[in-house]
């Protein structure tokens, strides 16, 4: 399944990423391990994860 992950970075940039994982939880785990901006280092976590329609 593909998921769209939307979040704000510490530099106030809005990031939208499309990831393909088996679950929404797995998509969030990918963010936690992101070497560029790990989820744990974000100052204000406003996170949206939604399923991506294949239409």
List the predicted regions and their residue ranges.
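Ser/Thr- (and often Asn-) enriched beta-sheet segments in non-cytosolic proteins
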Residues: 2-4, 18-20, 46
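Short aromatic-glycine-(Arg/Gly/Cys) micro-motifs in beta-strand/loop hairpins
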Residues: 1-12
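A short, exposed loop/beta-hairpin motif centered on an aromatic-Gly-Thr core
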Residues: 12-23
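Short, mixed-charge low-complexity intrinsically disordered segments
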Residues: 14, 33-55
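N-terminal cationic amphipathic segment used for targeting or macromolecule association
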Residues: 24-25, 38
């Amino acid at each position: 399944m593909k998921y769209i992950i939307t979040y704000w970075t510490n530099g106030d940039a809005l990031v939208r990423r499309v990831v393909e994982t088996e679950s929404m939880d797995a998509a969030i785990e990918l963010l936690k391990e992101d070497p560029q901006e790990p989820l744990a280092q974000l100052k204000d976590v406003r996170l949206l994860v939604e399923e991506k329609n294949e239409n």
